[in-house]
Amino acid sequence: MSLFPQILLRLLFLAFTLKSTSNAEKHDKVDYKDFVRRDDGDTCLRYTTIYSQGEYETTITIPPNSYSNGVSLSNGTLLSTSSPLISTSGQFTSNNVSTTSSQRHNTKTITFFSGTSDYTSVYYDTTGTDDVVYEYHPSSERHKSTNDTWSTNLPTNPTTTAIYSTSGSSNITTPYSNRITNSNTSVNDITSKYLSVGTITLTTISGSDLYTSTFPANGTTSGTVEVVIPTAGTVTETAVSGSELYTSTFPANGTTSGTVEVVIPTAGTRTVTKISGSKFFTTTTDASGTVSGTVEVVLPTAGTNTMTVVSGSRFFTSVVSASGTVSGEQVIVYPTAGMVTETIVSGSEIFNTTYPASGTRTGTVEVVIPTAGTVTETEISGSELYTSTFPANGTTSGTVEVVIPTAGTRTVTKISGSKFFTTTTDASGTVSGTVEVVLPTAGTNTMTVVSGSRFFTSVVSASGTVSGEHIIVEPTAGVVTETVVSGSVGYTTTYPAHDTVSGTVEVVEPTAGVVTETVVSGSVGYTTAYPAHDTVSGTVEVVEPTAGVVTETVVSGSVGYTTTYPAHDTVSGTVEVVEPTAGVVTETVVSGSVGYTTTYPAHDTVSGTVEVVEPTAGVVTETVVSGSVGYTTTYPAHDTVSGTVEVVEPTAGVVTETVVSGSVGYTTTYPAHDTVSGTVEVVEPTAGVVTETVVSGSVGYTTTYPAHDTVSGTVEVVEPTAGVVTETVVSGSVGYTTTYPAHDTVSGTVEVVEPTAGVVTETVVSGSVGYTTTYPVQGTVSGTVMIVEPTAGYVTVTTSLGSSSYATTVATASGTSTGTVLQVVPSLFPGCNSKCTSSNAFRILVENDSISPSYLTYRESDGFGIASSNPSPAGSEGIFYYDSTLKRVVTCCDERPYYRTMEGDLAKTYFFIEDEGDGTYKFKLTYGAFSEYLDVKILADSTFFFKAMDSSSSTILNQKVRASNVYFKAVPL
């Protein structure tokens, strides 16, 4: 059942509340009793009484070793006996017994006297049978004082207590479960189900308002769960996943095992829920001075790690020394400290706001992979063999830092009828999370390449060299990506944080040193050696595709991520190679069906230039495939300009590489140093545009919108234009289409814009009702176009009622200046109506009626108010609302509904709602002057039903009753 009908049903049933006619009156309190161990070691017998308006507890403290009958409590165990009741007649002085009573919330107070007193504990019957009063037998709950000698009789059964009914003798299960499980259970293991130590939970129902608060007691700290995995020692782990093999060895000497620390529940949280009429208010705030729970994980622990990975023809081996190294660390804060979440439901509107508390920060995740040490890597790709060794001395391990969720995000969701609106904004002054990785650091590189008959060996000295550096920001530094899925609706927003800079990729391969080359072709062998003295080493600097650009592809399971983005203030990439003499080097390698042709310029040479650069600088493209869900996002980095395409062919300063592996071919062209890229007249897509496509089952989402501060391309046709987000959702028979612009964007100046920037178009089809809404986003300006379809700033709603369709167009957007077309749908309400509106009115469906479908319907033909039948004509069902003054459901003309129960809708036999005059109502079945009350039950899902009486109750059952076990349900218009 959706939220809107539930709210209306609550209103309906508040008006139809029944007062039971049972013989016994309910009492307004419930008593509980259990044993607890106090911090000072005393064993306490605690009595807790909960009233309908609050609660309080009274504790009798029984010190250890106080019993004279030889049964001791000093070991923390309970008395052992097989009898139904423990009769502890042991004597101990009143000086050893203390009685305390504390009032919790506007309640009565129990006092245990030192004289003679009898106590009776009253319980509610929870078995669902007749309402009967139960009480303890006097001998099971009596405390007397004679000459300072106390006698205590306590029940021992862990789940039941010998209690007796006023109407007979029977054992009844008490409505609480926190009993001692057996006679040998330590009281240290007992935790009261009610009023847990250090935590106060208060629930109050006053009228239609429900208040729930949970907060820690003064000076207490929430509970913790601590796990250590694995324990200290030597651990050898081998994992095979697909073609990947992982082996890790951790020495025990001096190492520390990983820890897992959980705090549940989070300390210092207060939650208040209020229900007032149809409004629900929920607020969660942190208590003053408290800190939220933390989860800490250390994986793996410090030590020596050996990892071998086989992926296709590639082998990776890494050895990390434990000496002086620090293990990777992962720190998670869940939930985020200092966060306030507020949910308000007012009528059909839902408001959700999440924002950080004053002075708090969001949680962080930190990972160090791999840790500092020695890394040896061997890679075989086809006929190529690569081996690299990196010493640990002076190296620094990589770091990964993530902040989830992004600090300071506010999300508001509004539901109006079948329409969903979601807005997400960032809080002022917050910064999004970053991911930073450093891969293999400075060291000595040895590379041997075998391609056909050619062997290449390069040795690079580590002395004075600079390590290759790989820095990744995922998502791009300062970029916030948020995805919200509500039902079948998915919302994704990507926007950059203020003044952030994107990441870079830089690789340095074989630097200054000695190069030895041996070529064997047939019986001819060639050997060339290049001395390092006074030579300038060949450098290869690759930014793929262009300099200052980061392209990252990650495949995890069925999930693939591809990201391309530029570094701050960088120029397109360069490839520079010196081999073996200055000038131009041309190299051709044929291996099997693979042909490689490379032309390298010598030092200080300048390559040719061309007119196309592909892909363009400053663009981030991300593709994620998870199951049947595909996500594609393209957006520019901060302060970048839209794209150019540059292609380099065999002219000077150009490197062209072609690799064929199986049926897969790869071709890459790199420009040389100091070249300038060409420009073109068309940019597709235009700069600053994000396009996202998501397919999940039968649900399809398409969204296009620009990044912050970007300007759309000026093109002949833009579909859709820059700054526009288009979303299409199909779920069953429901279709949603929404078009809206990103924050502060301006639409392109084009010949046709469909739809124009700054416009949101939403179409919802539910059953026979279709809704179409078009409206602008606040602060946006529509495009300058020849055709705008539909017109900006208008809401169009189409409603089908039976065979009739109505369309309404209303200008609702603030500040819009487009033409006005106003068509008013004929009113759903009768002419006498003065109370019903589209937001508060509903129909009442009768389920389980032998006439189906059945509604409470006005029947003017027989002049008898409201009767139940198939509506004729279609759409003639009665419309109702809740009158808060009358405190009941009435028609729009203030008529009080009837419901006929007999076959054929006999005018003389009907049911109606009778006002008892004390704020309660009864369902009454009438046949002429004869009347009976129906048996009415309210169900857990907030619907209710009533059933026909048996034949002994009424003569009216001589006719066929059709109202047996029927349900009423409110249905929104």
Curated annotation (Swiss-Prot):
GO biological process terms held by the UniProt record: flocculation
Similarity field: Belongs to the mam3/map4 family.
GO cellular component: external side of cell wall
Domain named DIPSY: residues: 820-973
Glycosylation sites: N75, N96, N147, N171, N184, N218, N253, N352, N393, N848
PROSITE patterns associated with the record: DIPSY
Region (18 X 35 AA approximate tandem repeats): 198-828
Function: May be involved in agglutination during conjugation or other aspects of colony formation. Induces flocculation when overexpressed.
InterPro entries: DIPSY, S_pombe_Mam3/Map4
Highest taxon of source: Eukaryota
Organism: Schizosaccharomyces pombe (strain 972 / ATCC 24843)
Signal peptide: 1-24
UniProt keyword annotation of Repeat present: yes
Name of the protein this chain belongs to: Putative cell agglutination protein pfl3
Sequence repeat start-end pairs: 198-232, 233-267, 268-302, 303-337, 338-372, 373-407, 408-442, 443-477, 478-512, 513-547, 548-582, 583-617, 618-652, 653-687, 688-722, 723-757, 758-792, 793-828
Pfam families for this protein: DIPSY
Compartmental location: Cell surface
Keyword entries, A-Z: Glycoprotein, Repeat, Signal
